[in-house]
């Protein structure tokens, strides 16, 4: 059977680092308050000339270099983002052009913080279906452009960045010892749409809008939803938490990350945490974390890795893969 195997990874961050001390100059907050409640110590903020597409392009080029490939070797591009450069065309098409790729096809996926999990699942379906052999999957965001910088409960949480994976078709046996994507589980429930949203859009207000979040409500649902979908993914692959080498969660909040891992019985040393470095970068957070952990040698070939995320909608999901 065909498996979608990781061929390369890459990441990109804006030039500007904004620490919690810097944030103290913007809103009424403190480093201690932010760290205790979120685990965040700094975030990267896009500057002039830095956009979702430009960051996505940089991450894509890093992934291609890591894989020893060029854009000519790709069949398709999927970009997960909630902060596109334009309403249309898609950011993926923009990046396709920036890479000099004039064949194949490209499109965006929008599932907010769950976007990268949705995008990897989509790429896997195209590969297993024989539509594409090699897919560039990017998560890229500039959430700093949709924040209310007077709201201390939200503006301290988010940052900008991009990460990418290249998935390619490989032969598998059908066993859970195969390399590549083993299984995935996706969920959504629009009944929660008003708990995390942006108050603008082309067809409603004609404006971009800013982010609003009912933080306590999101936290109340997060751990349960995340652990349920991870357990379903384990069951589908006939593995347990004990078999897992790495949990790579969406980097939203350290308390959510720790709470989910504890409920699942996953040891802290098996959890990749980068929220202190990047803040919440929405769809970019998982590929950024993967780039850090694979880049420093923690994640190695053959490791069993769980990706998980929850975002506005609510949307949530998990992907189990063998690196």
From Swiss-Prot:
It catalyses: malonyl-[ACP] + acetyl-CoA + H(+) = 3-oxobutanoyl-[ACP] + CO2 + CoA. It is an enzyme of class 2 (transferase). GO terms for molecular function: 3-oxoacyl-[acyl-carrier-protein] synthase activity; beta-ketoacyl-acyl-carrier-protein synthase III activity. Catalyzes the condensation reaction of fatty acid synthesis by the addition to an acyl acceptor of two carbons from malonyl-ACP. Catalyzes the first condensation reaction which initiates fatty acid synthesis and may therefore play a role in governing the total rate of fatty acid production. Possesses both acetoacetyl-ACP synthase and acetyl transacylase activities. Its substrate specificity determines the biosynthesis of branched-chain and/or straight-chain of fatty acids. NCBIfam families: fabH, PRK09352.1. The keyword Cell membrane does not apply. SUPFAM superfamilies: Thiolase-like. The lineage of its organism: Bacteria, Pseudomonadati, Pseudomonadota, Alphaproteobacteria, Hyphomicrobiales. Its EC number is 2.3.1.180. The last Arg residue of the ACP-binding site is essential for the weak association between ACP/AcpP and FabH. Keywords: Acyltransferase, Cytoplasm, Fatty acid biosynthesis, Fatty acid metabolism, Lipid biosynthesis, Lipid metabolism, Multifunctional enzyme, Transferase. One of its GO terms (cellular component) is cytoplasm. It comes from Rhizobium rhizogenes (strain K84 / ATCC BAA-868) (Agrobacterium radiobacter). GO terms for biological process: fatty acid biosynthetic process. The active site is at 113, 250, 280. Residues 251-255 are annotated as: ACP-binding. This is Beta-ketoacyl-[acyl-carrier-protein] synthase III. Pathway: Lipid metabolism; fatty acid biosynthesis.
């Amino acid at each position: 059977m065909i498996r979608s195997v990781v061929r390369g990874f890459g990441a990109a961050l804006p030039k500007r680092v904004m620490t919690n001390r810097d944030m103290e100059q913007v809103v009424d907050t403190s480093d201690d308050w932010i760290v205790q409640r979120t685990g965040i110590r700094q975030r990267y903020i896009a500057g002039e000339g830095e956009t979702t597409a430009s960051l996505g392009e940089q991450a894509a080029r890093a992934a291609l270099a890591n894989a020893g490939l060029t854009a000519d070797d790709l069949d398709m591009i999927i970009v997960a983002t909630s902060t596109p450069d334009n309403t249309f065309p898609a950011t993926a098409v923009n990046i396709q052009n920036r890479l000099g790729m004039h064949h194949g096809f490209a499109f965006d996926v929008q599932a907010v913080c769950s976007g990268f999990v949705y995008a990897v699942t989509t790429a896997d379906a195209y590969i297993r279906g024989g539509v594409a052999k090699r897919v560039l999957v990017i998560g890229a965001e500039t959430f700093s452009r949709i924040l209310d910088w007077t709201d201390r409960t939200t503006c301290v949480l988010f940052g900008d960045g991009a990460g990418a994976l290249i998935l390619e078709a490989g032969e598998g046996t059908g066993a859970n010892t195969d390399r590549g994507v083993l299984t995935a589980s996706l969920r959504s429930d629009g009944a929660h749409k008003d708990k995390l949203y942006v108050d603008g859009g082309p067809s409603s207000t004609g404006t971009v809008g800013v982010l609003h979040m009912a933080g306590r409500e999101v936290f109340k649902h997060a751990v349960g939803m995340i652990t349920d979908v991870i357990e379903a993914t384990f069951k589908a692959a006939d593995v347990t938490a004990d078999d897992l080498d790495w949990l790579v969660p969406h980097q939203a909040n350290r308390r959510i990350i720790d709470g989910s891992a504890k409920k699942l019985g996953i040891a802290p040393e098996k959890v990749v945490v980068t929220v202190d470095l990047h803040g919440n970068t929405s769809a970019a957070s998982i590929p950024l974390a993967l780039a850090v952990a694979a880049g420093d040698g923690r994640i190695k070939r053959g490791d069993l890795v769980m990706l998980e995320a929850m975002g506005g909608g609510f949307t949530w999901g998990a992907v189990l893969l063998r690196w």
